[in-house]
Amino acid sequence: VTLVSGPVSLPDPTGVKVVRIETARQMLDAVQAALPADIAVCAAAVADWRVAAEAGQKLKKDGSGVIPDLKLSENPDILATISQKGPKRPDLVVGFAAETENVIEHARAKRARKGCDWILANDVAPGTGTFGGDHNEVFLISGADGASDEVWPRQGKAGVARALVQRISRHFA
């Protein structure tokens, strides 16, 4: 098992190779270096955009009220990249979707757009208590038609992780 992780304050899991990264490009490179693999669980919330050119130092206010003009560049799409057909594609690619409206519809569209096998989606709209909260209601989207979608009970993150491991085990049984 290889864990590609950005900066966190959590201890490394026992028995896991941990690769530390700081940028989306580094994450993509590390994930690709870990392939081939049977399963890829892509849970990181990688930003869609990055600053095109780093300033190299803090951009300080000068009192003029002029806001700096920041140009953005698109970050690599890690989930879509590893979901592409090819000899190193994992047998099962799982992505995540945090949605604020039309959760299942948007998750189905994301699954199709990215080319992954499953999407675990949750509703993060204000009032759900998901952001900053301890519990999630999760939807497993595993087909285009909705016939194989699953609604998981509201549970903590550790419970969601256990349920995902059990679901993956059943998939490969």
Question: Where does each model-flagged region fall?
Answer:
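A cross-family phosphate/adenosyl-ligand binding-site feature
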Residues: V1-A173
